[in-house]
């Protein structure tokens, strides 16, 4: 989709162009960030990399000045852009990488693992920027990530691809409703029933159990009533299934 590789088979059209065939024109309107590969020049100040990108993308002086100011403020990098890239922490560098990808105000930005290896503070800063720029500039963000925190914080639409085929295309809300079963952490006196309709015991110890219920088949209230009628419940905690489990269920269903 970035136009770097030629496909073995099939085709891809983005903004009316075939990325690898129309690469020179195509790259004018896209930005790319690779989590494990820097797009900045290593031994020079970040600002010098920005200046070089300005020339590469032929960004007018006024537009460059305005865009640079906007991005340095939004990503809080004003104090570090005069520092050589190699001297930056991973979180600082990633914020500068993202700024570089947005300098020419692209219509589409591909972010490959943008939060990989970042601490919690840096992850939040990157995610907040992505949400804000998407809302304010209507920039299309295509995100590839193994961090389910990114999925939960940023995603409106999920596309699942396996073995070269589109397996699923839907909203995060619809997926959550379909796959998000409730987890009941129960502390009790007595003995767990041998049969519990539409409920699965995930973990069990002497007087505690973690029970998953399928809300497409049984209501939460009915499940709790069943347990209350068969056990002396000391404590009950209700949790939603994590995004990790939802993704695992998708992989299982589509045999990826």
Regions found by a protein language model. Give the residues of each.
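Conserved catalytic motifs of ABC-family nucleotide-binding domains
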Residues: 105
């Amino acid at each position: 989709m970035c136009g770097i590789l030629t496909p073995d088979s099939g085709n891809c059209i983005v903004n009316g162009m075939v990325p690898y065939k129309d690469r020179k024109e195509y790259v004018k309107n896209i930005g790319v960030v690779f989590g494990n590969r820097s797009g900045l020049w290593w031994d020079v100040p970040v600002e010098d990399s920005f200046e070089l990108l300005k020339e590469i993308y032929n960004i007018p002086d006024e537009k460059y000045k305005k865009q640079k100011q906007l991005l340095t403020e939004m990503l809080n990098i004003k104090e570090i852009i005069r520092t050589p890239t190699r001297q930056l922490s991973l979180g600082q560098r990633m914020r500068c990488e993202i700024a570089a990808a947005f300098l020419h105000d692209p219509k589409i930005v591909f972010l490959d693992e943008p939060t990989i290896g970042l601490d919690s503070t840096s992850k939040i800063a990157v995610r907040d920027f992505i949400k804000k720029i998407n809302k304010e500039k209507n920039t299309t963000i295509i995100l590839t990530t193994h961090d389910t925190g990114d999925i939960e914080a940023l995603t409106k639409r999920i596309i699942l691809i396996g073995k070269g085929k589109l397996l699923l295309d839907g909203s995060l809300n619809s997926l959550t409703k379909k796959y998000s079963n409730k987890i009941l952490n129960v502390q009790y006196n007595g003995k767990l029933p041998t049969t519990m309709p539409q409920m699965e015991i995930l973990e069990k110890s002497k007087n505690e159990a973690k029970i998953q219920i399928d809300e497409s088949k049984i209501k939460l209230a009915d499940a709790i009533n069943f347990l209350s009628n068969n056990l002396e419940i000391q404590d009950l905690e209700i949790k939603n299934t994590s995004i990790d489990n939802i993704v695992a269920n998708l992989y299982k269903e589509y045999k990826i």
